[in-house]
Each structure stands twice: as C-alpha cells, then as structure tokens.
Amino acid sequence: MCIRDRLDIVSGNWDGEHRIFVKKENTFKDIAEGQFKIPSKIRTVISADFDNDGYDEIFLNNIGEPNKLFKIKEKGELKEIDLAINSEPNGLGTGAAVADIDKDGILELLISHGETGNQILTLYKADIKKGNNFIRIKPLNKNGAPARGATVTLTSNLREHSKTIDAGSGYLCQMEPVAHYGIRKGEKDFKVSNKWTNGKTNNYKITKTGRTYIFKQSNMTISPS
C-alpha cells in the first residue's frame, strides 16, 4: 500500500490490533483506526484496487468469523465496505489470491478454506462495468521472468503511487506479478518509473489506459488488453 511514493506496511494480528504503518521522515506511524484496528482471527491481508476507482482496498480474510474490506481514501482515511453475505461469516478462510484471471482489467479475489473443516473455494469480483479505467504494469527481468521485488511508481496529475511486485505474496497470500492501478476521476498525464532490484530506474510515459504494459530492463512492449 502506498499513495505517496513511499511503501507502507499493513499488519494483521489475532491478539493485538491490526495496524497500518506509514513512514513519515525516519519513523513509522500507525494510522489504523476505528473498526479496522479490532483484532480478528486473520489469515490473509491483501491490498488491491478491486473496483478500479484509483483507491486501493484492504481485504482482511478471517477464519471462523466475517471477512472485512476497507477502502483507503485520501490521507489514509479508511472506509469500511459492507460485504453483507459475502463476508462469509461462517467461512473457514485460510489463504487468498488476487489476479486478473479472465484478463478483462478487473481483479478477481480467490479465497481458500479448510484447516478445521471442508469448504469450497470462493471467487469474487467487483460488480462494475468493464472499461479503460485501469493501467497494468508487468515488469520482467533480463531473463524474461517476473521481476519480483521491483518497485513500480505511477505518477499523474493527482498522485504518486508505488507498488512492489509480489510484495504481498507469502505463506497464505498470493498476488500476480503485476502492478494494477485503477484510474481516478479526472486523472491524466500518466508516467511510470520502474526501479529494478539492482537499483537502476527506467522511466516511461503512458499514452493509453485500459492496457497491460510489459516492461523489460532494456526496453518496453505492450501486450494486448
């Protein structure tokens, strides 16, 4: 999660409060508040822009209690989204993954269940119309493999927003090796910088939305949208 060209940390806890650590100068400040802070039997934390409005959401996947979803607004303000029955109040959530599975530019959320009982997989996506309100950046290293650990920064007239490739992947969380950005209202003049794991940075100008851009360390190509 980052909306200021600086990476932040989201931490979920069973016995202590959930936290959002935002770096300010040389220290981190916890900006979590309200319902977000309440401890839960959390198994997975995922940050992604599920509805392509240009503001990321934080998904909290719990086991044996309802899942929660929060939108990150300006200045770190958190707005809880009512998931209703899709909160899976009796779900035995274990892991989750986020990816554009059907390649329509809208992210899907796959949730796995089990551990204390048999439950099926569930697959969700936002109920929004397909459009060109997204930009997807897929960095590849010199060998053509996903550039895990590379940091992509989108700059526009409204924001600087950094995402590190596969930063959220781990034991129970998985994400595709793509930086997915929804587009805000009135947003334009898009530029992208890619900082590779060797410390070097390449800069690119984005002329069209609704596409997936594939960056290589020496050049750039555009894949079909």
Where do the protein language model's features map onto the residues?
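Beta-propeller blade termini
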Residues: 1-4, 42-52, 94-103, 123-125
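Carboxylate-rich, polar loop motifs that coordinate divalent cations or form catalytic acidic clusters
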Residues: 4, 20-23, 47, 57-58, ...
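Hydrophobic beta-strand segments that make up the repeating blades of beta-propeller
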Residues: 8-13, 57-62, 109-113, 192
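Short proline/glycine-enriched turn/loop motifs at strand-loop junctions of beta-rich domains
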Residues: 14-15, 63-64, 147, 186-187
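Beta-rich catalytic cores
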Residues: 16, 41, 65, 92
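Beta-propeller blade repeat segments, especially FG-GAP/WD-type strand-to-loop junctions
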Residues: 16-31, 66-81, 117-132
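Conserved loop/turn at the beginning of each blade in beta-propeller domains
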Residues: 38-39, 89
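Gly/Ser/Thr/Pro-enriched helix-cap/hinge segments flanking short amphipathic alpha-helices
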Residues: 77-225
